[in-house]
């Protein structure tokens, strides 16, 4: 099964990634991906693009050869207050805001601190999706985070890269997150976290967890472009209004 939506990708603008927007579009066409988000690392990361990169994402076309592009960021959660490294009116220019913990910006400490920081990011209203919350380097109170995400309408990511490239040992945590999300009505999304275009839309390991816990497909954001766009619009992203009509006739893939 090929899902048509990928919310988490990195380009050469993050210098530890290896593909361009053109590369991603080419692979998207090959794989049947209809909508993907360009979410390079926030500027607090050492090799992240400059702040202006995100301000200027408006130059990206909405559609190229039938593939839609979301203008976004994977911001860094910086502290226990849940602050991120992108702010103010500039956030309103983005279609999608991901945020997560990254060691160079916010080193791991303890479960209580991680949980408070993540929940504060969720409560801030600035973050749409929490990335790789199953990272074993940052243990959290999974039930508390899932409850908060459900209450504030924020999605939690099951990050496929965590099972294949980085954050090894994430499987048990991600399974627990999926189970808690099912119980508390939390929205989930699978993210490839691609750092090279070849892995765009690669969700096999994440999908296995979704299937294992029998998470409801109706709450999975990858189910269709229109589902993701409706989620983003409901969260106040007026910028996606011009994309919504382009996917009005799509149907869930599962």
From Swiss-Prot:
NCBIfam families to which the protein is assigned, alphabetical: PRK09248.1
EC number assigned by the record: 3.1.3.-
Cofactor: Zn(2+)
Residues that bind Zn(2+) 2: 16, 41, 195
Lineage: Bacteria, Pseudomonadati, Pseudomonadota, Gammaproteobacteria, Alteromonadales
Matching InterPro entries: Phosphatase_YcdX_put, PHP_dom, PHP_phosphatase, Pol/His_phosphatase_N, Pol/histidinol_Pase-like
Positions that bind Zn(2+) 1: 8, 10, 74, 193
Name the record gives this protein: Probable phosphatase Sbal195_1503
Keywords: Hydrolase, Metal-binding, Zinc
Keyword Zinc: yes
């Amino acid at each position: 099964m090929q899902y048509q939506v990928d919310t988490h990708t990195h380009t050469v603008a993050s210098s530890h990634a290896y593909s361009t927007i053109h590369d991603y579009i080419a692979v998207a066409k090959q794989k049947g991906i209809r909508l993907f988000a360009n979410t390079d690392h926030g500027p607090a990361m050492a090799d992240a693009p400059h702040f202006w990169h995100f301000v200027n994402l408006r130059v990206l076309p909405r559609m190229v050869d039938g593939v839609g592009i979301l203008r976004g960021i994977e911001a860094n959660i910086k502290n226990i207050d849940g602050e991120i490294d992108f702010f103010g009116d500039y956030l309103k220019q983005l279609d999608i805001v991901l945020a997560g913990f990254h060691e160079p910006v916010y080193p791991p400490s303890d479960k209580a601190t991680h949980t408070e920081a993540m929940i504060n990011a969720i409560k801030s209203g600035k973050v749409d999706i929490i990335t790789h919350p199953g990272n074993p380097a940052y243990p959290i109170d999974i039930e508390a985070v899932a409850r908060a995400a459900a209450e504030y309408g924020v999605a939690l990511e099951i990050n496929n890269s965590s099972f294949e490239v980085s954050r090894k040992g994430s499987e048990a945590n991600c399974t627990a997150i999926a189970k808690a999300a099912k119980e508390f009505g939390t929205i989930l999304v699978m993210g490839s976290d691609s750092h090279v275009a070849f892995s765009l839309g690669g969700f096999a390991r994440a999908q296995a967890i979704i299937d294992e816990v029998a998470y409801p497909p109706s709450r999975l954001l990858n189910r269709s472009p229109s589902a993701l766009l409706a989620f983003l619009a409901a969260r106040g992203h007026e910028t996606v209004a011009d994309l919504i009509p382009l996917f009005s006739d799509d149907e869930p893939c599962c």
